[in-house]
Curated annotation (Swiss-Prot):
It is found in: Cytoplasm. The keyword Membrane does not apply. Oligomerizes as a right-handed, spiral filament on DNA at oriC. GO terms for molecular function: ATP binding; ATP hydrolysis activity; DNA replication origin binding; lipid binding. This is Chromosomal replication initiator protein DnaA. It comes from the Bacteria. The gene is dnaA. GO terms for cellular component: cytoplasm; plasma membrane. Pfam families: Bac_DnaA, Bac_DnaA_C, DnaA_N. ATP binds at G151, G153, K154, T155.
Length: 445
């Protein structure tokens, strides 16, 4: 970075500082780093897309005017989302030692690395297993199966494994794909008669990372193709990493031959973060995004938001935005006001049959209409009985009302469902785990 650019920018932000409140300046302007100044174009590095959006909509004209006051020129401002590390490399004209092709770089999120992952009691085992696999692909645990609820860090760990392997061996062929994308590509390959290309893409590689594998349940052709892909990679001593929202034995309508293969290696779960981990996550986020958040505010967030990492980080950003837009200092009172809709809805929302039907349908990869339909196939009838059981346990609705909500069924059908699930729970461990998971998801709604 040239001395001229540095001096010009420092003078500009001194002018801008006089036009803003301290909280607005520290939150939005202080985090900017100048990258380059060419002709009438100034490139400025910002830490994230959220900051970029705020700067473009609220502060861009202020920056342009400050520079015009200094130089008598009107500059075009271009905000670039990047990190300090990337800025430094650009300044020094250094080449990255990680060599990946364009397709690879778009598959792995640069933010999801082991360094940015916050370790706590809830995820320590999954993190250790992921690092072991990254250090010794196909030698430590193969496959590695990571499961846990939404927003707990499964995808983060999978991307971190990919980055780590590419850093140590840039020539490795690493492919990250969601099960939905895998299915769509398979369908297109059949339609376009490109089966060979599809198989080459997923079988002639070193590392396969498949996210949300539970969505292939019930898709016979996809399961068939993935079975052969799994076998080809495993027999060639290539690493397979899989994520899901539940363990293999609880994925409904998954073929037994796939289920058993998923259990060949190591199964690691991620739980909701405890208070200490939630605090660490918030501090890490504030540090990365260069946000000045009082400790008591982070304690407030960590106490009120308990379900997952995404909601924690979302609450933090919401508070910062609320502070900037209202020109108020960040405090517990402001945090309470900013999050009142989120917190009150979590604290007061009652469990309803609609919520139960939504959660059960999602868990078993069904539509809510299936639970209300007249269809009696086991893959629908059993989840329907579970939903009726939970409706009886978790709501104050009468038996006739519950029956009515499930396609106008008689109250005796509800009684039968309740008794059947109650009896099965006494002897079926997998059902016990399913009910436990469903209860947790219902409570998080």
């Amino acid at each position: 970075m040239s001395t001229h650019l540095t001096e010009t920018w420092e003078k500009a932000i001194n002018i801008i500082k006089g036009e803003l409140t301290e909280v607005s300046f520290n939150t939005w302007i202080k985090s900017i780093n100048p990258i380059s100044l060419e002709n009438n174009s100034l490139k400025l590095a910002v830490p994230n897309d959220f900051t970029k959006g705020i700067l473009e909509s609220r502060y861009k004209d202020l920056i342009v005017n400050a520079l015009k006051l200094l130089t008598s020129k009107k500059y075009n401002i271009d905000f670039i989302v990047t990190t300090e590390e990337k800025i430094e490399k650009n300044h020094n004209n250094e080449k990255s030692n990680i060599v990946v092709n364009d397709e690879m770089s778009t598959m792995l999120n640069p933010k999801y690395t082991f360094d940015s992952f916050v370790i706590g009691n809830s995820n320590r085992f999954a993190h250790a297993a992921s690092l072991a696999v990254a250090e010794s692909p196909a030698k430590a645990y193969n496959p590695l199966f990571i499961y846990g609820g939404v927003g707990l860090g499964k995808t983060h760990l999978m991307h971190a494994i990919g980055h780590y392997i590419l850093h140590n061996n840039p020539k490795s062929q690493v492919v990250y794909v969601s099960s939905e994308k895998f299915t769509n590509e398979l369908i297109n390959s059949i339609k376009d008669d490109k089966n060979v290309e599809f198989r080459n893409k997923y079988r002639n590689i070193d590392i396969l990372l498949v996210d949300d594998i539970q969505f292939i349940a019930g898709k016979e052709r996809t399961q068939e193709e993935f079975f052969h892909t799994f076998n080809a990679l495993y027999e060639a001593n290539k690493q397979i990493i899989i994520s899901s929202d539940r363990p293999p034995k609880e994925i409904p309508t998954l073929e037994d031959r796939l289920r058993s293969r998923f259990e060949w290696g190591l199964i690691a779960d991620i739980q909701a973060p405890d208070f200490e981990t939630r605090m660490a996550i918030l501090k890490k986020k504030a540090d990365v995004e260069k946000l000045n958040i009082p400790n008591e505010v982070m304690v407030y967030i960590a106490t009120k938001i308990k379900s997952n990492i995404r909601e924690l980080e979302g609450a933090l950003i919401r508070i910062v935005a609320f502070s900037s837009l209202t020109n108020k200092e960040i405090s517990v009172d402001l945090a309470s006001e900013a999050l009142k809709d989120i917190i009150s809805s979590k604290q007061t929302r009652q469990v309803t049959i609609d919520i139960i039907q939504e959660v059960v349908a999602n868990y078993y990869n069904l539509k809510i209409e299936d639970l209300k339909s007249a269809r009696r196939t086991r893959n629908i009838a059993f989840p329907r009985q579970i939903a009726m059981y939970l409706s009886r346990k978790l709501t104050d609705m009468s038996l006739p009302k519950i029956g009515e909500e499930f396609g106008g069924r008689d109250h005796t059908t509800v009684i039968h469902a309740y008794e059947k699930i109650s009896n099965n729970l006494k002897k079926d461990e997998s059902l016990q785990n399913a009910i436990k998971e469903l209860n947790k998801r219902i409570n998080q709604k």
